[in-house]
From Swiss-Prot:
This is GTPase Era. One of its GO terms (cellular component) is plasma membrane. GO terms for biological process: ribosomal small subunit assembly. Residues 175-177 are annotated as: G5. Residues 9-196 form the Era-type G domain. NCBIfam families: era, PRK00089.1, small_GTP. Residues 17-24 are annotated as: G1. It is found in: Cytoplasm; Cell inner membrane. Residues 227-303 form the KH type-2 domain. Belongs to the TRAFAC class TrmE-Era-EngA-EngB-Septin-like GTPase superfamily. Era GTPase family. It comes from the Bacteria. Residues 43-47 are annotated as: G2.
Length: 319
């Protein structure tokens, strides 16, 4: 733990976990700002999203990775490759485990990926412990201690210990990212694992995302929320043109949503344009909370068949 006069620590912490383990919720919670889109639909994070946390003289650059999912489809293989490439370079590997689910093939694959680093730079956090017990109104420390004991003794905890037998016990935590319970202890240990180094980014910075990326992601988030049952993974978003107007007080943006079939386009547009109009208004409201501009946004819907099989499209979307 950093004390007065200690050298600053700075580094990159990669957040890894199976789809819907709460990685984006955790990132937004520790950053204090919306950095990554959140959806109940698995694998909505497609890029390595960076969120920056400054605590005293320390700086943690979090990287929220796509949910790790074993699949032979080209799209999912590219997501897996993205995670693998980032694991090697990170200073700390934060493994978020959904405490409500059993150990399965995806957890086994993640443990195999992290096993070479378990002694030195892996942290494990059982997330969603609030779901296991509906109330956290009792003393927080007692609640987390009790839940941690139950999880470690259960089948999930035993399987994780067997897969990562050399992970130190003091680097295993129980948290609720949604309710921000147990995060302080986790963050203290994470800071201790960072190398002594100067900050990588200015102290007032909380993400390195471009405005175009944030616009694209928020549009996609609203589209997924409106059409979650029909086409969550069949769409992508993009910005065609963007500029600051009216003395840099207005952000004008022409964007698009692309789907794979005409029938999906009809769902996204809706009767008399009702769905795409609602997506546009929701995106504008979300952008106004994040950006210091008046937002002028136009969204069109187009069909882009087989985009998930084209290398150049995947390269532009997954990075």
């Amino acid at each position: 733990m950093v004390t007065d006069g200690a050298s600053p620590r700075s580094g990159v912490s990669l957040i890894i976990g199976r789809p819907s383990s709460g990685k984006s919720t955790f990132l937004n919670a520790v950053c204090g700002y919306k950095v990554s889109i959140v959806s109940p639909i698995p694998q909505t994070t497609r890029n390595t999203v960076r969120g920056i946390v400054n605590i005293e003289s320390d700086q943690i650059v979090f990287m929220d990775t796509p949910g790790y999912h074993r699949s032979d489809r080209k799209f999912n293989l590219r997501l897996q490759s993205l995670v693998h490439s980032n694991v090697k370079d990170a200073d700390v590997l934060l493994y978020l485990v959904d405490a409500t689910r059993q150990f399965g093939e995806e957890e086994a694959a993640i443990c195999a990926l992290l096993a070479p680093y378990q002694k030195t730079r892996v942290l494990l956090a059982f997330n969603k412990v609030d779901v296991l017990h509906n109330s956290t109104s009792c003393d927080e420390h007692a609640f987390l201690h009790r839940q941690g004991s139950v999880l470690r003794a259960g089948s999930l905890g035993r399987a994780l210990h067997a897969a990562l037998p050399h992970l130190p016990a003091d680097r295993v935590f129980t948290i609720s990212a949604l309710h921000q319970v147990g995060l302080d202890a986790l963050m203290r240990t994470l800071r201790d694992l960072l190398p002594e180094a100067a900050p990588l980014y200015p102290q007032d910075c909380y993400t390195d995302q471009t405005i175009a990326f944030r616009v694209t992601e928020l549009i996609r988030e609203q589209a997924i929320a409106r059409c979650r049952d029909e086409l969550p993974h069949a769409l992508y978003a993009g910005v065609e043109d963007m500029e600051l107007r009216r003395g840099k007080r207005e952000l004008w943006c022409r964007a698009f949503l692309a789907v794979e079939r005409e029938s999906q386009k009809a769902v996204l547009v809706g009767k008399k344009g009702a769905v795409i109009r609602a997506i546009r208004l929701d995106a504008i409201r979300a952008l106004r909370t994040l950006l210091p501009y008046h937002i002028s946004l136009d969204i069109r819907v187009k069909v882009d068949r087989s985009w998930r099989q084209r290398d150049h499209t995947l390269s532009s979307l997954l990075y």
